[in-house]
Amino acid sequence: EMARQAARESIVLLENKDNILPLSKDMRTIAVLGPGADDLQPGDYTPKLQPGQLKSVLTGIKQAVGKQTKVIYEQGCDFTSLGENNIAKAVKVASQSDVVLLVLGDCSTSEATTDVYKTSGENHDYATLILPGKQQELLEAVCATGKPVILILQAGRPYNLSKASELCKAILVNWLPGQEGGPATADVLFGDYNPAGRLPMTFPRHVGQLPLYYNFKTSGRRYEYSDMEYYPLYYFGYGLSYTSFEYSGLKIQEKENGNITVQATVKNIGQRAGDEVVQLYVTDMYASVKTRITELKDFTRIHLKPGEAKTVSFELTPYELSLLNDHMDRVVEKGAFKILVGGVSPQYVAKDRIKDSVGYADSKKGLSGMLEYTHEFAAD
């Protein structure tokens, strides 16, 4: 049960167009496709396990639905091969279904099985972010059937999901989910568990954006590309839910010892119970050296029933506001700090005075406030 709960809590919902998820367990036909659908992905350095200990996504789907639902499986292609494949068979199966669950991504099981070519893990870097092998071709061919496609990215790294975000009705990332990954994924797909995972990394639009991370330092120059959008596809800290939350009552107070207390109230304004990952970010507005656009300082995960509200409290220490000055001494400087609390990382407008734009579009995303910090601490 612990493995199943850990897998459920880590799943990140990236897209849910027209609220297609959660699915009904009474659907007539579900196609489960892709090289990861009936493959076991416990992750790197996994010891050999006993038969039956690991459950695939296909197994989880079959266990979740009723007897009246027909589940059809077709691999379509393997993880890496560019040669012979069964994409045509997968397309045929997809065209006969009510919904398609397409499981693509990585293979990282060489410690548990033999004769498997890994695509993720130690010593397996990739020069591209396109899905390996024929997986991208499989995705586009299946989506061309017109059937609603839900992409399950079972991976240990970000991939370029630009095309998938256009074509798929929903996208979720279940990573390399371990021995109970299949049932945990089914729990999210059918609404037995409300997803609340957040991205611990940034998903770029293109490999040309790398390195790409949320807490970059401002350059004082232009932030743009001539041939594509500057911003990432999915931001660090991003993730959707089957319910909605609203933030209010942000309070920021500087204490005599230099600590800062931050409070905000979070309310579930939707119709489903669910978790919210409340994230605390800080932006140092002006400093003696260049500082990062924003930085995650703390987070907490809370559970709220429909209509329920909770007040979340954080405490920042002076060290968490400190920087390395031009002498490489760690110091704390007084001045303006922007304090941000929300369910996702704050957004920004990539132009001059970029820090001024860091914030949230509305109270459903989060809140921000300014603090004129009065303490100064020099290096020991």
Model-predicted segments: where are they?
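C-terminal non-catalytic regions of proteins with extracellular/luminal or membrane-system context
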Residues: R4-D380
